[in-house]
């Protein structure tokens, strides 16, 4: 289970500040 990847995908749908720290732009 790749949590970071899941967060990144969710961020593409609904961006949030936490995503910028975890995922590349």
Swiss-Prot record:
GO cellular component: extracellular region; membrane; other organism cell membrane
Entry's localization field: Target cell membrane; Secreted
GO annotation, biological process: defense response to fungus; defense response to Gram-negative bacterium; defense response to Gram-positive bacterium; disruption of plasma membrane integrity in another organism; killing of cells of another organism
Entry keyword annotation includes Disulfide bond: yes
Bridged cysteine pairs (disulfide): 8-23, 11-19
Alphabetical keyword list: Antibiotic, Antimicrobial, Disulfide bond, Fungicide, Membrane, Secreted, Target cell membrane, Target membrane
Reported function: Antimicrobial peptide active against Gram-positive bacteria M.luteus (MIC=1.6 uM) and B.subtilis (MIC=3.3 uM). Less active against Gram-negative bacteria E.coli (MIC=63.3 uM) and yeast C.albicans (MIC=24.2 uM). Not active against S.aureus and P.aeruginosa. Has no hemolytic activity against human erythrocytes. Probably acts by disrupting membranes of target cells.
Name of the protein in question: Panurgine K
Originating species: Panurgus calcaratus
């Amino acid at each position: 289970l790749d949590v970071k990847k899941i967060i990144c995908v969710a961020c593409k749908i609904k961006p949030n500040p936490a995503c910028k720290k975890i995922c590349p732009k």
